[in-house]
Amino acid sequence: MFIVNNDIPKHNNAANMSTVSSIIDAIEIVINAKMRRTGICGATETLLCHEKVINSILPDIIEKLIDQGCEIRADRNIKLLNKNINDASEKDWQTEYLDKIISIKSVNDVSDAIKHIEQYGSNHTDAIITENYKTAEIFLNEVNSAIVLHNASTQYADGGEFGMGAEMGIATGKLHARGPVGLEQLTTYKYQLRGNGQVRP
């Protein structure tokens, strides 16, 4: 799952904060998160879009996704943006497509996004794009996923990227011990990554 908040990340340029580069970064993050490798567990399957940016940044994201052969399934608010968007069903919000398909839903705020993620998410990887530090911290701390990212692609959800070597599997449960259980076996991790527009090559 992924949320584009109404506060798009801004990065310094020589003169001032550049909103244009921020929008480009946000678009590139979303495209990379979905399309870099669609068949991996870190691929974004649902995009939750803040209602305030539906008409500004989302049309560009939708156009780029469609240009790359991605099928879009969306709620009524999003569907109005492009005639090539299909209706999303209740099942779409919880589907791991592992393909060039994405579901898009509008949300009122970060709390609305978190509620959606709690109801439909896999507890694997979730990300937020925002320059608002407070909003990002709420998301990072309240979303109950193994990996949560701020301003970076969900494609970073990989053991190799965490310096763990070859990835043998993914666990999203909080308790994964088997056999004798000591203090170390009761330990679980939540990884929080803070980015600045990073996409995975």
Regions found by a protein language model. Give the residues of each.
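ALDH superfamily catalytic-core signature
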Residues: 1-99, 150
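Conserved C-terminal structural/oligomerization subdomain of aldehyde/semialdehyde dehydrogenase
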Residues: 89-201
